[in-house]
From Swiss-Prot:
GO terms for cellular component: cytoplasm. This is Probable serine/threonine-protein kinase WNK1. Belongs to the protein kinase superfamily. Ser/Thr protein kinase family. WNK subfamily. Residues 27-284 form the Protein kinase domain. It comes from Oryza sativa subsp. japonica.
Length: 704
């Protein structure tokens, strides 16, 4: 048992309070938790509750000009301790220190810090977490603005929003500068310039200035940039805000829905929505969506487990991995609505695209559109990674028949794009089309897509990628929407590599004076009878085989050197292919060149040995046609042989996870001429009137 002397000694070792409130309940230490221009936050202790609190001290300086102002301000901040809301920082008490000209108020203390610090600490945040924070902040603002008279914060920013990290809660804090709006408008210019609405500078504003500041907070959350960080002086910020110029960070937001939501918050005062209206905004509506069961109110949605996309993905995988003997074979697939933690990590819609172990922004996706004179829309989707690999995807968009979601789903299925990019690409398409066509109304989202009508003739289990076999079958003879499938034209190249001369490479001779080119460093990929032989040499070599695995002999690849004497020009090959693509896109009913069948609209028959089956591909330095397959003896009728249709399907619908092997690894770098051709196609540059006939290196299959 400790005696009085021991207690006194122990008390002497304890740090002394630097200051005590008038009631003696709260004691302030000298430990500084945070410091701003006019406010310092200290660690303090509540002796009655036995818990640590935050002691906020604000320097008044020139805020108070008379005793009347002091009395008014004291009454206003005294009222703040009556605020009780789960998204408002608890305000225990406050008082004015007249002698030191300070305002002191005691609030709850957060160990996770401010939202800005928390956001910078956790870089990998899902879009649903951001929405969760937005709903909580707006809920707190709605509570403040619903008072009579309304309470406005006047200094809302991420530095004044605090996080309870173990529960994912955010609370609005730093209400020491808030004011009770006793009149119709406030008449004091107070706040942080980067977050102040234009009307604040005019000293004529209402509670909607908090909505403007909230929009800047959302912008900072998704870009990690302070608004108007491009400005070096407050005067520059003032000029931009007054003129209506938005911060440059806004134009770095690639998600059109996020950008549109921020723009609603930054609109002029007459058009700016209230907190109640923003809570009803579609961007924040999550009640109608399907969530994984979890402990919190807001769980991460697993888009790929919805039936609409589950069937589309499973059918492409089924036909690509060879798990079925026939394309039209039914495979039972449950409509899974449950979610696993691993699925959430793998399939969740990530605001910042990439895996956990990859750097932020590993893949950059941009979209750009062009509207022709006849009203048709052409879009280009550009996918680039940090390694310099660039994929340019060109496709038409029919504003009368297409929706962004259907086109994005079709693109993902056909071009082997990461599946969880479906909604991201759809939102980008909606945003670009809206910019080109002002009266365009975005199509239904994923949560609405199940009620939309879909073609079951060309779509296998409502998959937007469709089925070639179903299209070619007699059951789909009257189908029209299948003509849209295969609309995508893709060019893959290395962005920053060593330049090569196309004409020189096209005219180079083979070793041995035109003898058979031997394959070296071959890499074979077998997938349902499709065998691709890649090599690290001046040429790429391909061959088709039947669904039974066959060995491809190097003798199968023999180049016809007679074309070299005719001055084979690769640029004409590219131009011709792009001209064909533009022509078909202009008609809005383009069929991909790799599926060019004779008399498709009539008898839909295929010639023997698939002479018309072609595939245009930009390899290392050459363009060529894929050699025809030797028809199997047992296949007498191509129209009745499902393997042939499977083969045709795989030429257009690659297996997810094997796109690089299927499109040929590009080790050599692209020519500037090739990139210019791609750019010319997009910008609508005029092509020469007299184009030479397309030439291709003939690969004659020779029996071993």
């Amino acid at each position: 048992m400790m005696g009085p002397k021991a207690n006194a000694a122990a008390a002497g070792d304890l740090p002394e309070y630097a200051e005590v409130d008038p009631t003696g309940r709260y004691g302030r230490y000298n430990d500084v938790l945070g410091k701003g221009a006019s406010k310092t936050v200290y660690r303090a202790f509540d002796e009655y509750q036995g818990m640590e609190v935050a002691w906020n001290q604000v320097k008044l300086h020139d805020f108070l000009q008379s005793p009347e102002d002091l009395e008014r301000l004291y009454c206003e901040i005294h009222l703040l301790k009556t605020l009780k809301h789960r998204n408002i920082m608890k305000f225990y008490t406050s008082w004015v220190d007249v002698s030191r000209r300070n305002i002191n108020f005691i609030t709850e203390m957060f160990t996770s810090g401010t939202l800005r610090q928390y956001r910078q600490k956790h870089m990998r945040v899902n879009i649903w977490a951001v929405k969760h924070w937005c709903r909580q902040i707006l809920s707190g603002l709605l509570y403040l603005h619903s008072h009579d008279p309304p309470i406005i914060h006047r200094d809302l920013k991420c530095d004044n929003i605090f996080v309870n990290g173990n529960q994912g809660e955010v609370k609005i804090g730093d209400l020491g500068l808030a004011a009770i709006l006793r009149k119709s408008h406030a008449v004091h210019c107070v706040g942080t310039p980067e977050f102040m609405a234009p009307e604040v500078y005019e000293e004529e504003y209402n509670e909607l200035v908090d909505i403007y500041s909230f929009g800047m907070c959302v912008l900072e959350m998704v870009t990690f940039e302070y608004p108007y960080s491009e400005c070096t002086h407050p005067v520059q910020i003032y000029k931009k805000v007054i003129s209506g110029t938005k911060p440059e960070a806004l134009y770095k937001v690639k998600d059109p829905m996020v950008r549109q939501f921020v723009e609603k918050c930054l609109a002029t005062a007459s058009r700016r929505l209230s907190a109640r209206e923003l809570l009803k905004d579609p961007f924040l509506q999550v009640d109608d969506l399907v969530f994984c069961p979890g402990d919190g109110d807001y769980s991460l949605m697993n888009y790929l487990r919805q039936p609409y996309l589950e069937h589309a993905y499973s059918n492409v995988s089924m036909m690509s991995n060879g798990l079925s003997e026939s394309i039209d074979e039914d495979t039972p697939t449950e409509d899974r609505w449950d979610c696993e933690d691993d699925d959430i990590k793998a399939d969740g819609i990530d605001l910042f695209n990439g895996h956990e172990d990859e750097p932020l922004g590993n893949v950059d996706i941009t979209i750009k559109g062009r509207k022709s004179e006849d009203g048709s829309i052409f879009l280009r989707l550009r996918i680039a990674d940090n390694d310099g690999h660039v994929r340019n995807i060109y496709f038409p968009f029919d504003i009368e028949a297409d929706t962004a979601l259907s086109v994005a789903t079709e693109m993902v299925a056909e071009l082997d794009i990461t599946d969880h990019e479906v909604t991201r690409i759809a939102e980008m398409i909606d945003g670009e089309v809206s910019a080109l066509v002002p009266d365009w109304r975005p199509g239904p989202g994923i949560e609405e897509s199940q009620d939309t009508t879909y073609c079951h003739n060309c779509g296998s289990n409502v998959s937007s990628c469709g089925s070639l076999y179903a299209y070619m079958s007699s059951a789909a003879r009257g189908c029209q929407c299948a003509e849209l499938h295969g609309r995508f034209e893709e060019i893959t190249f290395q962005a920053n590599g060593e330049q090569t001369d196309l004409q020189d490479s096209g005219g180079s001779s083979d070793d041995g004076g035109g003898q058979t080119q031997h394959v070296k460093d071959q890499e074979a990929v077998h997938s349902n009878g499709f065998v691709q032989m890649g090599r690290r040499g001046p040429r790429d070599q391909f061959c088709f085989s039947s669904f039974q695995e066959q060995s491809c002999s190097p003798r199968h690849y023999e180049y016809d050197t007679s074309l070299q004497a005719k001055g084979f020009d690769m640029k004409h090959e590219v131009k011709m292919a792009k001209y064909k693509a533009r022509k078909m896109a202009h008609l809005r009913r383009a069929i991909h060149p790799s599926l060019d069948f004779d008399n498709l609209n009539g008898e839909r028959r295929m010639k023997s040995s698939l002479n018309k089956l072609q595939s245009f591909h930009i390899g290392k330095n050459h363009n060529f046609r894929i050699p025809t397959c030797e028809r199997s003896p047992g296949a007498r009728d191509a129209e009745e042989d499902p393997d042939i249709f499977n083969l045709a399907y795989h030429s257009r619908h690659p297996d997810p996870g094997a796109q690089r092997a299927r499109h040929c690894e590009v080790d050599a770098q692209s020519s500037p001429d090739l990139m210019f051709t791609a750019r010319s196609y997009y910008t609508g540059a005029q092509l020469p009137t007299n184009l030479p006939r397309t030439k291709s290196v003939t690969l004659n299959a020779v029996d071993a």
